[in-house]
């Protein structure tokens, strides 16, 4: 757990009168704990508390190989995960809730909580902290940008050959990033030739580059993220 970052979030909570904060966004949980998890449809929650008694709720199918320095509550698919969260909030007054948390979990927690408990949108507590980058983060962002420049140069050269389709070029992007020290794509890359190439979220096809075509490339690499 990154205690310095957690303390900043706790300060934000205190300023807004929240005694607990439910965080469900995996990237925010990773930012605060260093634990990277992709839960899919299963409930995954970090519950921060002003008293320092923090708890993470994990499905028993998740893999954990590090000491997170907090309480861990494990549940199975056959168990009522949100009820476990509600139990941890039985004495809560004001609970901040992640803007990305699914209603199917939140509604169950609200149903089981005490009548005096108030739920508020609480993501701003984490968002404010993440907006202000630490020096190490700035260094990583600069390096990620440098690597992306090198990667896109290679992609431009692939496109310039003229014998590769949009899909064929797109499929090589992840390998290019990995060769430069990145873990892969940060999102699905877009390579678009010619007319309508600037359409939002274009999906590549078997189009080949023709003389006079414009080329749209939208790509990014994941570097120590």
Language model: regions and residue ranges:
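Generic secondary-structure signature for well-ordered alpha-helical cores
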Residues: 114, 143-153, 157-161, 174-182, ...
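Residue-level detector of alpha-helical recognition elements and their boundaries
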Residues: 44, 110, 155-156, 163, ...
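Short catalytic-site patches enriched in acidic/histidine residues
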Residues: 29-39, 125-126, 132, 164-225
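A composition/biophysics-driven feature that prefers long, compositionally simple stretches
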Residues: 1-150
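Short, glycine- and charge-enriched coil/turn segments that flank and shape catalytic ligand pockets
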Residues: 90-93, 115-117, 158-165, 208-210
């Amino acid at each position: 757990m990154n205690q310095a970052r957690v303390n900043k979030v706790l300060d934000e909570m205190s300023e807004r009168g929240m005694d607990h904060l439910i965080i469900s966004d995996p990237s925010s949980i990773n930012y605060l704990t260093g634990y990277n998890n992709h839960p899919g449809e299963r409930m995954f929650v970090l519950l921060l508390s002003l008293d320092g008694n923090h708890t993470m709720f994990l499905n028993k199918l998740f893999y954990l190989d590090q000491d997170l320095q907090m309480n861990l509550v494990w549940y199975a698919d056959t168990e009522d995960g949100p009820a476990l969260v509600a139990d941890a909030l039985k004495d809560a007054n004001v609970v901040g809730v992640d803007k990305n948390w699914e209603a199917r979990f939140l509604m169950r927690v609200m149903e089981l909580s005490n009548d005096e408990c108030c739920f508020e949108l609480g993501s701003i507590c984490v968002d404010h902290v993440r907006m202000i980058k630490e020096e190490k983060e700035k260094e990583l962002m600069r390096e990620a940008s440098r690597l992306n420049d090198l990667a896109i140069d290679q992609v431009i050269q692939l496109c310039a050959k003229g014998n590769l389709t949009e899909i064929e070029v797109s499929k090589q992007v992840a390998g290019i990033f990995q060769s430069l020290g990145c873990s892969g794509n940060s999102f699905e890359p877009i390579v678009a030739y010619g007319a309508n190439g600037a359409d939002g979220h274009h999906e590549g096809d078997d189009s080949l580059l023709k003389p006079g075509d414009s080329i749209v490339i939208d790509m990014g690499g994941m570097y120590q993220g």
